[in-house]
Design a protein with these regions (language model features):
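Non-globular targeting/processing and membrane-anchoring segments
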Residues: 1-135, 145, 149-152, 161
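Thiol-based oxidoreductase modules, predominantly thioredoxin-like and allied folds used
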Residues: 138-142, 168-183
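C-terminal regions of proteins
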Residues: 186-193, 213
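Thiol-/selenol-based redox modules, centered on thioredoxin-like
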Residues: 214-224
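Conserved helix-turn-beta segment immediately C-terminal to the redox Cys motif
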Residues: 131-133, 154-175
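Short acidic, S/G/P-rich loop/turn micro-motifs used as interaction or catalytic elements
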Residues: 143-147, 181, 209
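Sec-exported extracytoplasmic/periplasmic mature domains
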Residues: 119, 165-168, 193, 224
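A short, hydrophobic beta-strand/beta-hairpin element that forms part of a small beta-sheet core
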Residues: 197-213
Length: 224
């Protein structure tokens, strides 16, 4: 009787162990597949970013020409801004769900370069064509935000999304990571007196810096 009981207990133990190993292995496999799916989505976005970077460099050359149709150029700039904005939302969605590997950080830098180039083009276009849109540049801490900074950035992001939905083409919303050690971004931050320890920060029309905000009205008052 005792031997049978021992055998049964041993059988239960091995069954439970095998079941645990199976569930654990299945969990790892599922996590691996999900991570691969996210990474492939991010890679797809960055392949498009390569084309966009080339496109925006050509746009920059076009703006230097003596004769351009401001109406058409402004329209295309707005369309490009909308695409960059939508891609930025997708990128953040996939990046937040993935581990910040060196590969993902490197790929994120490509989009930061794209957005920075777009920002410069938007400045030039405003000067050249006397446009009435506002550049709203959101510079944030990407790699190592503290819990306090992360919470603050969540508030900033939600308010800026709400502002973009409300203002539409009246603003060029340009999110850029300020801590990715990109020389061009660092130069611009220095030019506008923005320090990394101040992040996150909202820069409006290269003049107004906002470091604390609780509602969109506090941003809108600078857009009227």
């Amino acid at each position: 009787m005792t031997i049978e009981l021992f055998k049964n207990q041993k059988h239960v133990f091995w069954t439970a162990l095998l079941l645990t190993i199976f569930i654990f292995s299945a969990g790892i496999l599922l996590g691996f597949l999900i991570e691969n799916w996210r990474t492939s989505k991010i890679a797809s976005l960055y392949q498009q970013s390569e084309l966009d970077l080339l496109d925006i460099r050509i746009q920059n050359d076009i703006y230097s020409l003596s004769e351009i149709d401001c109406t058409k150029v402004i329209e295309e700039n707005i369309n490009f801004a909308d695409r960059v904005f939508e891609d930025a939302k997708l990128l953040e969605k996939y990046s937040e769900s993935s581990r910040l590997s060196n590969s993902i950080i490197l790929q994120h830098k490509k989009y930061d370069l794209l957005r920075t180039s777009f920002w410069i083009n938007s400045i030039k276009l405003k000067e050249r064509c006397k446009t009435d849109y506002h550049n709203v540049v959101y510079i944030y801490d990407y790699q190592n935000p503290s819990l306090e900074t992360e919470a603050k950035q969540d508030v900033f992001s939600k308010l800026l999304l709400e502002l973009k939905d409300k203002k539409g083409n009246k603003i060029m919303l340009i999110p850029i990571a300020g801590d990715n050690n990109i020389i061009s971004v660092d130069i611009l931050m220095n030019a506008y007196g923005i320090k990394k320890e101040e992040l996150p920060i909202i820069l409006i029309d290269e003049k107004i810096k906002i470091t604390n905000v609780e509602n969109i009205e506090e941003i809108e008052k600078y857009l009227d």
